[in-house]
Amino acid sequence: MQIVRLLALLALLSLLAAAAASASAPIPAEKAGKAVLPELQPSWFLALDYDGAAYVFDGADGEVKGTISHSQYTTAIVTLPSRKEAYLVDSYYSRLVRGTRTDVLTVVDMSNLTTKAEIQLPAKTATLLIRGHIGLLNDERHVVVFNMTPAQSVSIVDVVDRKFVGEISTAGCAIVMPVELRSFLMLCGDGTLQLIELSADGSEVGRRRSKVFFDVNKDPVFSEVKYTGSGWLLTTHNGSVREVRVVSGRIDIGEAWSMLTDEDRQDGNTKEQWRPGGMQPFALHRSAALFYALMHKGKVDTHGQDGKEIWVFDTNRRRRVARFALPFEGRSLLVSQEAVPRIYLSDKDHKLHIYDGYKLKLQRSIDDSGLSGGALLQALMPYD
């Protein structure tokens, strides 16, 4: 009996010794993997909010392809598929919300959504979710970043040589609209457009102003401008639309047309009319020349109100071709540039909804989008 007990005790001691040896052995560190994305697809889009992540969605199936990390003060992202890079401005404070501020232009590798480089900028970039606060010029070398302190200026960045080129004063003007080679337009508070031209090294070589074509006190232009392929569509708070272009260094301001018919105006009254509105109220499908707008009935200065309907316009014929009521209020609007466009919509509950852009039928909703606030929706293209 004593021999049996002794054998049992020895067996127990052996197990304890083995366990102790196993516990003391170092566990190999697990290495994080790095997935490689397939080629960017025209159905992919970005949803960016203030919470530090831009989600890359595929509108074809509603799946998340990955996330791009950014600061809480990032304004928008510019994607350059030909170089497989994206550019965004990050602003950081040494004490999170106070202290020394550092602004950088972050270069993202779009093959795996990791950071490739940082280029330090003057610590004065505007920090609103507005697509037009950053622009890539068509030399695919210079990125223009809008600053406001409240003095207005732009920072010019060479993303090929990875360096800050310089700062250009743009007093009274905002929104970067790339046009001819190394040139960009800006909207100005005096009702004009400003054209700034750069040299090959990114320094300013010329600027000019257009004639006055709108009154900021009577009918302001939205900051949400849409690239047409040859120029930019500008829309006012009352629904006046026109295209502006630059031809051989000359600013061409197209004739305005109205989103509202006489019947639309009669549907309203002296206080409330149909108006465009929302955080991101417009989208344009370039090849089909279809202009989509979030619309609501409201008083003057309700341009931030979410839309209850989507109106669709043929910009060639300058007339509405469709309208449909939404089962929710739309906040941000984007249209893919696929042959058959998809409409991407966000709402106040941070959900995303995807519609067929021709049939205007719901394809899917993404209830758990990961977004925590109003989202800026962007295509993975240089000017969208």
Question: Which ranges hold each PLM region?
Answer:
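A short beta-strand motif characteristic of beta-propeller blades
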Residues: 25-28, 63-69, 75, 114-125, ...
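Repeated scaffold domains used in trafficking and secretory/extracellular systems
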Residues: 30-36, 72-82, 126-135, 170-181, ...
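Short, conserved, GDST-rich strand-edge loop motifs in beta-rich repeat architectures
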Residues: 32-43, 88-102, 293-307
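Short coil/turn segments that connect the beta-strands within blades of beta-propeller domains
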Residues: 41-43, 82-84, 139-141, 181-183, ...
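Short glycine/acidic-enriched loop and turn motifs that connect beta-strands
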Residues: 51, 92-97, 150-151, 191-193, ...
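Short loop/turn segments that connect beta-strands within beta-propeller blades
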Residues: 59-61, 110-112, 158-162, 198-201, ...
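Asp-box/WD-like beta-propeller blade repeats and closely related beta-sheet repeat scaffolds
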Residues: 113-155, 159-177
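Loop/turn-rich, solvent-exposed surfaces of beta-rich toroidal or solenoidal domains
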Residues: 274-315, 319, 323-339
